[in-house]
């Protein structure tokens, strides 16, 4: 338990360190400083600097752990402890001046996510959770919304801008969910979406073709807040996620099964 608490404290420190970089540079990134690392996939010096700060913090405390970042890959290997970090979740939002973005720091032991910290710098909101210790935002305990009514439910979603699938699959799922629930929103940052479901702002979420650094931290927070989730795909590879309170999770999962191979 003491180790778990230490891992959590380091995750929070690391998320805040990365978030400070994002705060200092928000609204200042120029077009010439933005690189296209892949089709419709952008990165700037801010992402890289944030990742460096986060890695410095983690490796200072746990030099034998593996740290896997979105921008600069993995450092260390062979440890059962792996940190998955997204130094800037919501890059497109960030470079366009839209304040929904975050730093995501998650720890996995073996195959199990055990610690997560997600920091939203613009709103100064720090979410955190650890296995068996609950989920919090700025020190306040959070729980998923106790809502079983589809017509009153809010769902967040995300489609990949560069898909390996026929986009009609996602559009069909969206359509079927849209007709049944009260509202749907696309904030544009998966870690933020998971935290907002954990906090009870929304009831459910569906995101497709996610990487482990996108969701590891948020999954811990969601689960500790009483939420449930289903991952479809490769463990710690590319995966789809359906999450929420039990009622919304189960509904979205049944819709997804109509259009995708979901083995659960």
Swiss-Prot record:
Family to which this protein belongs: Belongs to the inositol monophosphatase superfamily. FBPase class 4 family.
Pfam families per the UniProt record, alphabetical: Inositol_P (PF00459)
GO BP term, example: signal transduction
Residues binding Mg(2+) 1: 70, 86, 88
Reported cofactor(s): Mg(2+)
Uppermost EC category: hydrolase
Sequence positions that bind substrate: 89-91, 185, 190
Record EC number: 3.1.3.11, 3.1.3.25
Record InterPro entries: IMPase (IPR033942), Inositol_monoP_metal-BS (IPR020583), Inositol_monophosphatase-like (IPR000760), Inositol_monophosphatase_SuhB (IPR022337)
Its job: Phosphatase with broad specificity; it can dephosphorylate fructose 1,6-bisphosphate, and both D and L isomers of inositol-1-phosphate (I-1-P).
Alphabetically ordered keywords of this record: Carbohydrate metabolism, Hydrolase, Magnesium, Metal-binding
Gene Ontology molecular functions: fructose 1,6-bisphosphate 1-phosphatase activity; inositol monophosphate 1-phosphatase activity; metal ion binding
Binding site for Mg(2+) 2: 86, 89, 214
The reaction(s) this protein catalyses: beta-D-fructose 1,6-bisphosphate + H2O = beta-D-fructose 6-phosphate + phosphate; a myo-inositol phosphate + H2O = myo-inositol + phosphate
Signal sequence segment: none
Entry superkingdom: Bacteria
Protein name (Swiss-Prot/TrEMBL): Fructose-1,6-bisphosphatase/inositol-1-monophosphatase
